[in-house]
Each structure stands twice: as C-alpha cells, then as structure tokens.
Design a protein with these regions (language model features):
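Solvent-exposed, acidic/flexible segments
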Residues: 39, 49-56, 82-89, 98-102, ...
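Aromatic side chains
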Residues: 29-30, 45-48, 93, 110, ...
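Structural microenvironment flanking redox-active thiols in thiol-disulfide oxidoreductases
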Residues: 67-98, 103, 107, 111-131
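Generic detector of short, locally flexible boundary/turn motifs and exposed helical patches
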Residues: 37-43, 58-60, 92-93, 132-138, ...
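Sec/Tat-exported extracytoplasmic proteins
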Residues: 49, 64-67, 96-100, 109, ...
Length: 202
C-alpha cells in the first residue's frame, strides 16, 4: 500500500518526461490474453471502496483527455471490495452509466466513502447519494433493478473474471495488456505507456 501511495504521488507531481521511455513486457505490462479487442479500448477496473482508485481519478481524467478519438474508454466496477455493499455500488455505477450521470454521481460517492469516511449502508443510502448529485430518485428506482442494469453488472463480472483482475485500480488495454504501474514515474509516462500498448500489434 505504501508503494502504491508513493507511485500515485509521483504520477501527480511529475507531469513531464525528460526522455522517451522504453516499455518492456513483464516490467511495464503483462499479456493477460492472446487476442486484442476488435476495436481499440482502455478499460479501468476500480471500486468506490478503493482509496487508491480515488487518488487515481485525476490521472484517469487526464488519460481520457489524451486518448485518440477512435479509442473507447470503459470503466468496470468490481464487486470484491466493500463486503455486501460492493455489489450494490457496482450496480449503482451501472445505474449512473445508464442514466448518463456518472460524472455527477461518481465524485459524490467517492467523497462520501473516501473523504467523509461514511460509506452507504443500504440501497436507500445509495439512492440518497444519487439525489445529492442532482438525480431524480424516481429515475434511480426505475433503473436499479432493470434488465439493462442487471445485464451491465453481469458484464462487469465477466470482464473481471476473464481478465483475472484481483486488485484495483487496474488498467487493461485492448483486452490484452495489463498495465504495471510499479516503475511509472509520472502521469505522462503512464499515458505514454497506455498509448504504446494501444499501438501494439503482436
């Protein structure tokens, strides 16, 4: 955990590279599957209960700004943190995504858990957080158990399992390359690594 904290601080305070880095398999990335996705994509695995995911938010925001136009950015919430509320907040993310209010809701949930230290204890608490973010509670009610949201949650679990995700935050590029952040020294180096993996053909 201490290593991850040092890494995150380094990524945030060192925005520019002095030289173009050389990225190597099993040092900067791992191959987790043998085939690429049909179209270029970056998938972030995260949990609202993960403090490092919260600290990673500005880094991911900068990454999204710099991704090529043809690259799809996806977020996959995992259910293995947060005990019984883990799956509930995984479903909450799906609701926010379906209602196209994720950018409003995610900061509110992260703040409640990571800054205020007062995580939601029930679906009613989650609903209240949506309302705090400006979402009509009735819209939440109509979506939370919908077929669409249930299907999204099932896909999140399939992604987590098929890519063998055991820790967050994790970033997978083109469904094949798992980013290793241990040796990354800045946000720009992290983004350069992601772009490098997007271009890999082997």
């Amino acid at each position: 955990m201490k290593k991850m904290f040092v890494l995150l601080v380094g990524l945030l305070i060192a925005p520019f590279l002095q030289a173009a880095p050389e990225f190597k398999e099993n040092v900067n990335y791992e191959i987790i599957r043998q085939t690429n996705t049909p179209k270029p994509e970056v998938m972030e695995f995260f949990s609202y209960y993960c403090p490092h995911c919260y600290q990673f938010e500005p880094i991911m925001a900068e990454l999204k700004k710099q991704l090529p136009a043809d690259v799809t950015f996806k977020r996959t919430p995992v259910a293995f943190l947060g005990k019984e509320m883990g799956p509930e907040l995984q479903r909450a993310y799906a609701v926010a995504d379906l209602l196209k209010v994720e950018e409003k809701v995610t900061p509110v949930i992260f703040k409640r858990i990571q800054t205020e230290g007062n995580p939601p204890q029930s679906r009613a608490d989650v609903r209240a957080l949506f309302e705090q973010a400006g979402v009509d509670g009735k819209d939440f009610d109509g979506a939370v158990d919908s077929f669409a949201v249930t299907g999204m949650v099932a896909q999140y679990d399939r992604n987590t399992g098929s890519m063998n995700i055991r820790a967050v935050p994790s970033t997978v590029v083109n469904g094949k390359y798992l980013v290793k952040t241990e040796g990354i020294k800045s946000t720009e180096e992290y983004i350069a690594l992601v772009k490098f993996l997007l271009q890999k053909k082997d």
